[in-house]
Amino acid sequence: MARPIVVLVGPPGAGKSTIGRRLARALNADLVDSDELIEKATGKACGEVFSELGEPAFRELEAHHVAEALNHDGVVSLGGGAILTESTRELLREHDVVWIDVSVAEGVRRTAGERTRPVLAADDPVEHYRNLLETRRPLYEEVSTFRVRTNSRSPQQVVAEILHHLEDD
């Protein structure tokens, strides 16, 4: 069975997709994004699927596609809330998981104005993002084997740090 080189987790706006693409290129590997698997299967954007199904049904669908993604080699990037599902966290225990971390201020800045992320829709985006991070932080800590912060750092710097981590393993 195939096994990912590394799995990327982190909140919305942390840079998982950007880092994932660059990391896959640096490793000469494929990138599998669980959000893209959902979009391909449903023919709709993840945010639209989330809005239509509601969070519990969306998380169930997401868990199915996360399990599928974890059967690929290469780099795997998971949606920001994938770690909310216990079965996903159990599967991640068997993998090298890098937590792409970001501050509240930077995460809000990066996701400002994005209507494609209903999980971030709020009257007070800063407070909402802070609450989201407070809820998810212990879960990211639980599943990750390595943490990299993206604040004020270029994607190249973040990728270099992850590559160094992978070489040390």
Curated annotation (Swiss-Prot):
**Disulphides:** none
**Which parts of the sequence bind Mg(2+)?**
S17
Where along this sequence does the record place binding of substrate? D35, R59, G80, R136
UniProt-listed SUPFAM superfamilies: P-loop containing nucleoside triphosphate hydrolases
Q: Which cofactor does it need?
A: Mg(2+)
* Class of this enzyme: transferase
| Name assigned to this protein | Shikimate kinase
